Amino acid sequence: MDILTCALALLSGVIGAGFASGREIDRFFAGHGAMSGAAILCALLTLHALFVRLPAQLERAGVSSLSGLCRVRFGRAMGLALTVLFILLSAITGGAMLSACAELGALVLPMRHAYGLCMGFTLALGAVLAFLGIPGLAAAGAGLCALLPMLLLRLLSLPAGEACFLPAMTPDLPVRACVDGAAYGALNAAMLAGALPMLLTLKPGRRRKASLLFCALFGALLLLGTLVCRHHRQAIALMPLPFVYLSRALGAGGYTLVALCMYAAALSTLCTMLCALARYLPLPRPTGLALGAVACLLFAMIGFGRIVQSGYPVLGALCAALMLLLCLPLPTSSFAPQEASQSSR
């Protein structure tokens, strides 16, 4: 049961509004045509490798948080600076997801002040789920596993739409598809970096099984979403939100379903970011969650579009590169003092 719970908790962090809207799937996977399978495989391999390697690094360094590993790897001052980067990534991502939930509420709910009310409700709900820890994240992941297949299967059953033109595209090389898949996996793992210490509750063998189960669940959703985008390739060309566009054919019920999927995806990512912020901050968990919620709220005031179109992608890429560095073998001198102090006790 703990393996399934951890796998669902991981799933809740990697599926955000961009995934549920189809934008990320079309950009990183379906756009590669016949090579989309290679992109999916590389993304899953990258996620699995990082999810197994990083907790092992934490155990080897004798620390229980990413900030501690940064200090061991890069020294106190540089470790603190890098931890601030991961804190910024979590707060900005949480703010973007909170803003997305509020915008969805304003679009769906026929009431005044729907934006502000939905933002407040979402932040409170996200804080409660984050306070529950792994069970709260797993509940959000289970909700996504129930909602997304319903949406994707309904979209896949629609007849292929027609377009007035077929976009001219040269065949993609396997290398480009693999690079896109690996980059997607690394970016998502970087956003989950602060929550990955939850895997330390499992022994290495069970940790590997939890990661494999996560890859199976996430891979199935990725494959299903890619099939939808490829099936409707002509109709969704140049569409910023492919699944939202396709849901028009499903009527009001389809529009509500895709909005619910996007809300659940954004909420689950918000919960994961709040958990990560609580782990990054050297404060009691309730205080860390409260400060994390305030940080997400401040960034949400900027608006989803401005956040995504600003330096957010660059920050994500930088944190992904730093995470890869953290997975490199630790020099013996980095953790010998910790082991010596522990043995003296």
Label each PLM-derived region with a short phrase.
Residues 17, 91, 98, 137, ...:
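Hydrophobic alpha-helical segments and their helix-loop junctions in multi-pass secondary transporters
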Residues 10, 41-67, 228, 232:
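Juxtamembrane transmembrane-helix boundary signature
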Residues 3-4, 28-53, 208-223, 313-323:
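Extracellular loop-to-transmembrane helix junctions
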Residues 229-252:
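Membrane-interface interhelical connector segments
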Residues 2-20, 36-39, 89-90, 94, ...:
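Hydrophobic, membrane-embedded alpha-helices of multi-pass small-molecule transporters
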Residues 22-30, 65, 131-142, 195-217:
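Hydrophobic, small-residue-rich membrane helices and short re-entrant helix-turn-helix hairpins
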Residues 67-76, 97-118, 200-220, 270-292, ...:
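Helix-loop-helix connectors at the membrane interface of multi-pass transporters/channels
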Residues 5-11, 38-48, 80-91, 98, ...:
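Transmembrane alpha-helical segments of multi-pass small-molecule transport proteins
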